[in-house]
């Protein structure tokens, strides 16, 4: 039986596209993946004893050096939408339970922790702080 070469090429492209989609979805991350990363980093400190949702909540709601808190933009309930304190730009809910797209991309997680910690706290957040915040956000229903 003779096959048409264009059919073979077409089937090959479909298989490549499917493999790409599988690879992409296999690379999708979850909040728990970031917790593992933060924990590995935090364990470099011999005093690390684990993350705390309560410490994360306190940090999230505490006003820091620039008179802002995380809650200034993300609200005291991170399961609801917020808005930027200066620009009033809408911000989707931060809690993964309310917004499943949160904490699924290393690029975005790194970008937003870097930017927001510098803006709100005036410095880079520690792995302990990041883990506490994420533990808190994962506990919000």
Language-model features, listed with the residues they occupy:
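The canonical Cys-X-X-Cys-His
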Residues: 66-78, 133
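Short alpha-helix boundary/capping elements
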Residues: 64, 78, 138-141
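Short cysteine/histidine-rich zinc-coordinating motifs and their immediately flanking basic loops
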Residues: 82-89
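Post-cleavage N-terminal segment of exported redox proteins
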Residues: 1-53, 97-141
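Local sequence-structure signature of Cys/Sec-based thiol-disulfide redox active-site neighborhoods
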Residues: 57-67
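Short glycine/proline- and charge-enriched loop/turn segments
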Residues: 90-95
């Amino acid at each position: 039986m003779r096959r048409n070469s264009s059919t073979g090429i077409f089937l090959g492209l479909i298989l490549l596209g499917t493999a790409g989609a599988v690879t992409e979805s296999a690379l999708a991350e979850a909040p728990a993946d970031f917790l593992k990363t933060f924990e590995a980093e935090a364990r470099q400190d011999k005093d690390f004893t684990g993350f705390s949702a309560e410490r994360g909540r306190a940090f999230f709601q505490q006003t820091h050096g620039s008179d802002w808190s995380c809650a200034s933009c993300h609200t005291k309930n991170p399961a609801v939408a917020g808005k930027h304190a200066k620009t009033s730009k809408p911000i989707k809910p931060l809690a993964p339970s309310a917004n499943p797209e949160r904490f699924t991309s290393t690029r975005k997680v790194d970008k937003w922790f870097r930017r927001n910690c510098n803006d709100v706290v005036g410095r880079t957040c520690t792995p302990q702080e990041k883990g506490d915040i994420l533990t808190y956000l994962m506990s919000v229903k």
